[in-house]
Amino acid sequence: MSEPEDPAHHASIAVWDLTSPVVIGRRTTLKAGLACSSGCNLNGSRIEIYDETGTRVGGGEAGAEPWPATSALYWAELEVDAPETEGEHAWSVRAAAPGTSHANVTSGIRFIASRPPEHRVRVEVIEQGSGVPVADVELRVGRFRVATNDAGTAHVDVPGDAYEVCAWKLGYQMLSHTADIAGDTTIQLVMSVEAAPEQPYWM
């Protein structure tokens, strides 16, 4: 029987830097870390990643240095085997800290897997009327997300398919456009400034 967790030493897992969509059949990386509520040194903690079938797809040990700007998030960059099928996936992350003060911890991670990219899409966003490039526009090309740079452009690599292209930025009307991607291409989007709400007139 495992030792009960000391309530003063509650451990938790954080997972970040997993690209989504993940390309099927390719190895990818993510970062995972373990922290104790009492700030314990968790260097050497085992962190393992399992897919929906319970198959281990990656793992490693937390390093000696906490993640920058944290006092006790001990982390590792892990290589993992990507799924072989497209769509949504839910994996589990399991961590075991050294010693008996901390119970084993489990968390989940959800992501999308996609076919390998085939074509490069350049997206140009300008403002209606002025023609000025619009920076920092959040773009979604199907499951792929990107944002425009200061020149109002962004690039994304996608497999050939029909995609809904959505653009959003505060102060502009949301824009949706359908595009059939069968080769390298450029998509130009024209965004309209959102009208300011009418102010009520008070006597």
What name fits each language-model region?
Residues 98-101, 166-180, 192-196:
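A short, solvent-exposed loop/turn motif at the edges and junctions
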Residues 42-45, 121, 129-143:
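Short, ordered, surface-exposed loop/turn motifs in non-cytosolic proteins
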Residues 37, 79-86, 161:
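Short, surface-exposed loop/turn segments at beta-strand-coil junctions that are enriched for proline
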Residues 32, 119-127:
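A short, amphipathic beta-strand motif
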